């Protein structure tokens, strides 16, 4: 399908207007919709509905606006939700006509069309052309402003007289606040009391009245409903509303004219309540049904996946909060009705894959998206790896849905990104407690870059070591490494997928020890190949290692903590050796923290 045939759908709106149909704010359809592909049409807005110049081209897409759905058949699928939508915006079966609602959406009062950019680095790593839809570049750094503003702009002055209200601690809150300020409407946002200050301050900065209420989201939501009824406020739902869905659908509208439809294979969307994917899928499947629309959820927040399997909405007992923008226990009623008919698949991803996707996006754009904002990229990578596209030149489009990242999450993401890329391996290794074992293990791992090394003396027979290092290809390199370790009479276990090890145990390795003649040193290691090997070889004549902790933090210098069992009368000799090595060092043997927590 060409871009020209796509835009004929817009021209049909003009014909329908001549037939007496009224559209809300048709003036907001951009002139580019008529002229970008050289179509000969005049500007048209709500004051020019009788302009005969609109009917200038014969549409090539028959039935793109008029649905030939049998009312008796479709009536079975009608949602119980009652929406206040003009009759001319309904299909014969009484459900919303999302093509018309999307084409007449009021989103361009508050945003510009967001770019669709080639992800060069991601394309190279996946072997397929990948494009990024930059919803992180809207005024509130997420797509949510589209649906929120479209809903509010559809309301009349009487409905907006007392103001609007929403319950949200995330991107929807900012979208409502920004739109309310633009429209000159009073907005109240209800958030749980434990909402981080950075989030509620951002909403307040946009002019909304922020009410912190309740210990959790359910209590805040109940308070929102109470206030709406008591003060006669208009509730702006985050996803389960036709105007919100249609507003998000304008992303699909933009994508279809930003890329050659003949080369477009699939669009990937993060899924929470379903508003984003419902809007995009419903529009795209009407215009370009050959394009796949694929949802992406996390393994611990997969309400849509389970609902599609059971063919009814399923409520999750608990949801993971890492990708908080999609942490929804129950998808919307209207969104589920639409999604169940219009999407092709749902793929699940984990935390490490999301962290890797955030890094991928950063390498391509130098922007840091939030976890839910990177889910589409993570899902695309998993889907393409499992289902190789028949045409390797077919484009994959990922929606970067948001970039409202909490700064304190960056450390966790940086630590887990390489695991998600399968570029880092975590091992638990048991080695014999004898001279040279530590160095032998190090020599097996090198010249690979070691990212962490933790060891604490426990007994005279064996030692347990926790280590991580970078590999080029985990699948091919790891079996060889494990074999080499086994040949040294050591036992190794791959714990790269062990959540307890990655999140907690790595920081608790060791504990108190009563090992004799131990001294503690803190050293600065240069981050270069051979630095650790140089240290081990230099000290082996004067001491043995009883504690060692190293963690690569991404800088030029790494901080190392080493417990050394110094041979009799060799303390001064050890200090001379440390000076000769040239690394900065501090003797921490009398540090009260060491004496209290690491010594028996």
UniProtKB/Swiss-Prot annotation:
InterPro entries from the UniProt entry: ACT-like_dom_sf (IPR045865), Ser/Thr_Dehydratase (IPR050147), Ser/Thr_deHydtase_PyrdxlP-BS (IPR000634), TD_ACT-like (IPR001721), TD_ACT-like_sf (IPR038110), Thr_deHydtase_biosynth (IPR005787), TrpB-like_PALP (IPR001926), TrpB-like_PALP_sf (IPR036052)
Summary of activators and inhibitors of this protein: Isoleucine allosterically inhibits while valine allosterically activates this enzyme.
Residue numbers bearing the N6-(pyridoxal phosphate)lysine modification: 144
Reaction(s) catalysed by this chain's protein: L-threonine = 2-oxobutanoate + NH4(+)
Cofactor: pyridoxal 5'-phosphate
EC number(s) per entry: 4.3.1.19
Ribosomal protein as UniProt keyword: no
One of the record's GO cellular component terms: mitochondrion
Gene Ontology molecular function, alphabetical: pyridoxal phosphate binding; threonine deaminase activity
Keywords in alphabetical order: Allosteric enzyme, Amino-acid biosynthesis, Branched-chain amino acid biosynthesis, Cytoplasm, Isoleucine biosynthesis, Lyase, Mitochondrion, Pyridoxal phosphate, Repeat, Transit peptide
Pathway the protein takes part in: Amino-acid biosynthesis; L-isoleucine biosynthesis; 2-oxobutanoate from L-threonine: step 1/1
Keyword flag Transit peptide: yes
Entry's localization field: Mitochondrion; Cytoplasm
Ranges for domain ACT-like: 425-497, 519-590
CDD domains: ACT_ThrD-I_1, ACT_ThrD-I_2, Thr-dehyd
Alphabetical GO biological process terms: isoleucine biosynthetic process; L-isoleucine biosynthetic process
Catalytic class of the enzyme: lyase
Sequence similarity: Belongs to the serine/threonine dehydratase family.
Quaternary structure annotation from Swiss-Prot or TrEMBL: Homotetramer.
Name of the protein in its database record: Threonine dehydratase, mitochondrial
UniProt organism field: Schizosaccharomyces pombe (strain 972 / ATCC 24843) (Fission yeast)
The organism's taxonomic lineage, starting at the top: Eukaryota, Fungi, Dikarya, Ascomycota, Taphrinomycotina
């Amino acid at each position: 399908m060409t871009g020209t045939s796509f835009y004929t759908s817009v021209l049909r709106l003009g014909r329908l207007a001549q037939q007496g149909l009224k559209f809300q704010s048709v003036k907001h359809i951009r002139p580019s919709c008529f002229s970008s592909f050289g179509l000969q049409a005049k500007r048209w807005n709500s004051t020019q509905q009788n302009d005969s110049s609109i009917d200038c081209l014969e549409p090539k897409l028959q039935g793109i606006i008029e649905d030939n759905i049998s009312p008796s058949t479709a009536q079975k699928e009608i949602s119980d939700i009652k929406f206040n939508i003009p009759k001319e915006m309904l299909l014969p079966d009484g459900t919303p006509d999302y093509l018309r609602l999307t084409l007449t959406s009021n989103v361009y009062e508050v945003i510009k069309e967001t770019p669709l950019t080639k992800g060069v680095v991601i394309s190279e790593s996946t072997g397929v052309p990948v494009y990024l839809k930059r919803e992180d570049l809207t005024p509130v750094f997420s797509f949510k402003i589209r649906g929120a503003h479209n809903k509010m702009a559809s309301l009349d002055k009487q409905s907006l007289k007392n103001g609007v209200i929403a319950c949200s601690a995330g991107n929807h809150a900012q979208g409502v606040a920004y739109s309310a300020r633009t429209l000159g409407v009073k907005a109240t946002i209800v958030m749980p009391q434990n909402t981080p200050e950075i989030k509620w301050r951002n909403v307040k900065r946009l002019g909304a009245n922020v009410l912190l209420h309740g210990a959790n989201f359910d209590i805040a939501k109940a308070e929102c409903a109470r206030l709406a009824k008591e003060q006669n406020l208009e509730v702006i739902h985050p996803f389960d509303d036709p105007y919100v869905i249609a507003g998000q659908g304008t992303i699909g509208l933009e994508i279809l004219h930003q890329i050659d439809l003949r080369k477009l294979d699939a669009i990937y969307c993060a899924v929470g309540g379903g508003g984003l994917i419902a809007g995009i899928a419903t529009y795209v499947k009407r215009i370009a049904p050959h394009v796949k629309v694929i949802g992406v959820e996390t393994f611990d927040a997969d309400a849509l996946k389970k609902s599609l399997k059971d063919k009814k909405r399923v409520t999750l007992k608990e949801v993971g909060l890492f990708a908080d923008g999609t942490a929804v226990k129950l998808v919307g009623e209207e969104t589920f009705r639409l999604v169940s008919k219009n999407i092709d698949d749902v793929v699940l991803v984990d935390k490490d894959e999301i962290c890797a996707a955030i890094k991928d996006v950063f390498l391509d754009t130098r922007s840091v998206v939030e976890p839910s904002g990177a889910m589409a990229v993570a899902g695309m990578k998993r889907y393409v790896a499992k289902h190789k596209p028949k045409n390797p030149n077919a484009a994959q489009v990922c929606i970067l849905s948001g970039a409202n990242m909490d700064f304190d999450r960056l450390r966790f993401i940086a630590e887990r990104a390489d695991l998600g890329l399968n570029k880092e391996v975590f091992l638990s290794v048991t080695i014999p407690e004898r001279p040279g074992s530590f160095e032998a293990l190090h020599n097996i791992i090198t010249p690979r870059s070691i990212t962490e090394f933790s060891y604490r003396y426990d007994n005279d027979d064996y030692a347990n070591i926790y280590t991580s290092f970078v590999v080029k290809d985990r699948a091919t390199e790891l079996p060889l490494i494990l074999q080499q370790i086994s040949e040294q009479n050591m036992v190794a276990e791959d714990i790269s997928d062990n959540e307890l090890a990655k999140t907690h145990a790595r920081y608790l390795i060791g504990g108190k020890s009563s090992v004799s003649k131990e001294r503690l040193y803190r050293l600065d290691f240069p981050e270069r190949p051979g630095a650790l090997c140089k240290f081990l070889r230099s000290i082996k004549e004067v001491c043995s290692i009883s504690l060692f902790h190293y963690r690569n933090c991404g800088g030029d210098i790494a901080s190392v903590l080493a417990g050394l069992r110094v041979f009799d009368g060799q303390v001064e000799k050890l200090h001379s050796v440390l000076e000769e090595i040239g690394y900065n060092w501090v003797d921490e043997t009398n540090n009260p923290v060491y004496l209290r927590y690491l010594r028996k």
